[in-house]
Regions:
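Short, mixed-charge low-complexity intrinsically disordered segments
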Residues: 11, 28-74
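Short aromatic-glycine-(Arg/Gly/Cys) micro-motifs in beta-strand/loop hairpins
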Residues: 1-12
Length: 74
């Protein structure tokens, strides 16, 4: 996965865009692993940590988990 860093946008935009990408990835992973909650959970954990380690980590981990919980509850 490529992470594009854009210098001239604000932190909120980065978080929103990152959360949207994460939401779509989480949704795909959960649907593919719907019979395996542990695998889906591990994927979400790795995804959240990879984003929180990136330069655009302004609260992103929490946003990813919140969006993931939305997917799971659908």
């Amino acid at each position: 996965m490529k992470v594009w860093i854009v210098e001239d946008i604000n932190d909120e935009t980065v978080v929103a865009q990152t959360a949207t990408v994460a939401y779509n990835i989480c949704r795909k992973s959960i649907l593919e692993n719907e019979d395996d909650d542990e695998a889906a959970g591990e994927f979400l954990n790795e995804l959240a940590h990879s984003y929180s380690d990136s330069r655009a980590s302004f609260g992103v981990e929490g946003v990813i988990w919140a969006r993931a919980m939305d997917v799971i509850s659908e």
